[in-house]
Amino acid sequence: MSNLAAMLRLPANLKSTQWQILAGPILILLILSMMVLPLPAFILDLLFTFNIALSIMVLLVAMFTQRTLEFAAFPTILLFTTLLRLALNVASTRIILMEGHTGAAAAGKVVEAFGHFLVGGNFAIGIVVFVILVIINFMVITKGAGRIAEVGARFVLDGMPGKQMAIDADLNAGLIGEDEAKKRRSEVTQEADFYGSMDGASKFVRGDAIAGILIMVINIVGGLLVGVLQHGMSMGHAAESYTLLTIGDGLVAQIPALVISTAAGVIVTRVSTDQDVGEQMVNQLFSNPSVMLLSAAVLGLLGLVPGMPNLVFLLFTAGLLGLAWWIRGREQKAPAEPKPVKMAENNTVVEATWNDVQLEDSLGMEVGYRLIPMVDFQQDGELLGRIRSIRKKFAQEMGFLPPVVHIRDNMDLQPARYRILMKGVEIGSGDAYPGRWLAINPGTAAGTLPGEATVDPAFGLNAIWIESALKEQAQIQGYTVVEASTVVATHLNHLISQHAAELFGRQEAQQLLDRVAQEMPKLTEDLVPGVVTLTTLHKVLQNLLDEKVPIRDMRTILETLAEHAPIQSDPHELTAVVRVALGRAITQQWFPGKDEVHVIGLDTPLERLLLQALQGGGGLEPGLADRLLAQTQEALSRQEMLGAPPVLLVNHALRPLLSRFLRRSLPQLVVLSNLELSDNRHIRMTATIGGK
């Protein structure tokens, strides 16, 4: 075995289980050998039996897979099985023409059995059965499966952007990690490749059916010529001998072909669920006893018609009635939902204490009673786990751990309603429907879907609540489809990011400082509280978070404060110098991996006018402020159309003023100063404010 590995330039230390990599090349060599070399009848029997067994195995694997990607090798297997059948046809044709004059067993026992036993030794019946099998395979199964594969490939490719956006949404919301996102993206790509391959592989099966008809005609004509001209047989004897052998050969090849075509149809028509095809069919066909009763009634009426086979119809009527009775009895025996136990009221009046004073939670969520299963682990609720992932991801990205989200039910809310509170005040609310999916239109979705129209609570996009059965259709049409718990988690993540500065209190500042002291004890000991008070540090960090600047790089922040705090105590001025020190991180945040940055700029006369207003201390004139706001809004729209970040680049002295003024009306706007941008980036002004 090691010598063989050396000859084939394979690793010498291949394990016995790794020699399966040679299965493909060996199979191709065997198929080519069958086409070229004459085979004895016994070997042909073995190969025909192997072909039948292989087709049955492929069909059963297709039936028991729960997702199409579990049988991603099916298009390749389809090609190999088609080649195997054609090679068997060539080998059997050779032996039929060479030895057909010797008798019915010339091509082996399998061909003889299919030619005599299955069709009673009558070649006319055999031809009819063979043609019917070919028509079923070619006109019905193969044509339908090919069309489904073609449409499925197109729809899967059209739905790829929506699926990718859903993966990105889960990743951004902290619901999945980077590894899981890569795995899901890979599965989306594999699914597209699979359906594209199935679109082409279905042509193999159709070609195989056509080849079967042509091979049968050629075998019959060739057999007649060989029998009459070479072996001196009579026309009738030659026709009977060679036609029966040809029919047996055709049937033993077409029956596995029909089985493989059925497997192809099962693969492309199945819906991906956690059940295999058999479970889906049984559960959906026999789930409703009313259907059984109506079917029994129809069969019973037919059974009472004179001249009909009454016994057969009435027998099936009784069977359906019994099945309906059994299904209904099983439904009635299903355990009912436990009723909530009402607690006995305690009329004893207890003196109020300070423990009765309820402090407001920094962050909370209230849910209606229909959403309780989403936050209950015992009912497989996923929301608590998603919230933990959100807090962890937020801490890794922004640099501090947000408060714990306290969740409680609120019977005053609508059943499917939830609301998110910060310090007791509602900052967001929405509806969620467990068991249904939110199809979000990113602006490129095609067509409409039946369902309840709504708006995505996090980003304000048009959306529709749809049933689970429409999920794949929505993805194909370009919608981003997410489940109910993901909707709530994404909304919460968005609000936490928006209110990061308010969630970062003095307690969080002290906890962060204690964490930094574990890594940099000398720096924190020298700085706080001797040079910078905790109040000033807290305010600087809050200012950074207010403009979406992460505070992960605490070393740079503290060292910058240690340098400038002795000569400047104003938190806003200190924030400005810290931002300059964090310039590389800020640039990377908004322009990752780009040498050329596309930003909005200020017209020079307008910049000069704003600097004069800033130095004079009189503020902006109302007319100038209105024009500045309107032109900034127009420039932001152009940035969005170009796919560029919403960044306005201004003079360092103007940045605090413009940031405070513009972000009141345009919270998505990011105002950067020229000193905060990395020197190695090329600046390109995509829009200029002023000059009008």
UniProtKB/Swiss-Prot annotation:
An annotated GO cellular component of this protein is: bacterial-type flagellum secretion apparatus
Membrane topology reported for the UniProt record: Multi-pass membrane protein
Q: Where in the cell is it found?
A: Cell inner membrane
Classification via InterPro entries: FHIPEP_1 (IPR042194), FHIPEP_3 (IPR042193), FHIPEP_4 (IPR042196), FHIPEP_CS (IPR025505), FlhA (IPR006301), T3SS_FHIPEP (IPR001712)
Which residue ranges traverse the bilayer?
24-44, 46-66, 71-91, 95-115, 121-141, 209-229, 247-267, 296-316
Q: Does the keyword Cell inner membrane apply?
A: yes
- Please verify whether the record's keywords include Iron: no
**Which Gene Ontology terms describe the biological processes this protein takes part in?**
bacterial-type flagellum assembly; bacterial-type flagellum-dependent cell motility; chemotaxis; protein secretion by the type III secretion system
- Principal subcellular localization: membrane
Cite the entry's keywords alphabetically. Answer: Bacterial flagellum biogenesis, Bacterial flagellum protein export, Cell inner membrane, Cell membrane, Membrane, Protein transport, Transmembrane, Transmembrane helix, Transport
Highest taxon, organism lineage: Bacteria
For this protein, the record's PROSITE patterns field holds:
FHIPEP (PS00994)
Give the function comment from the record: Required for formation of the rod structure of the flagellar apparatus. Together with FliI and FliH, may constitute the export apparatus of flagellin.
What family classification does the UniProt entry report for this protein? Belongs to the FHIPEP (flagella/HR/invasion proteins export pore) family.
Please state what the protein is called.
Flagellar biosynthesis protein FlhA
Q: Which organism is it from?
A: Escherichia coli (strain K12)
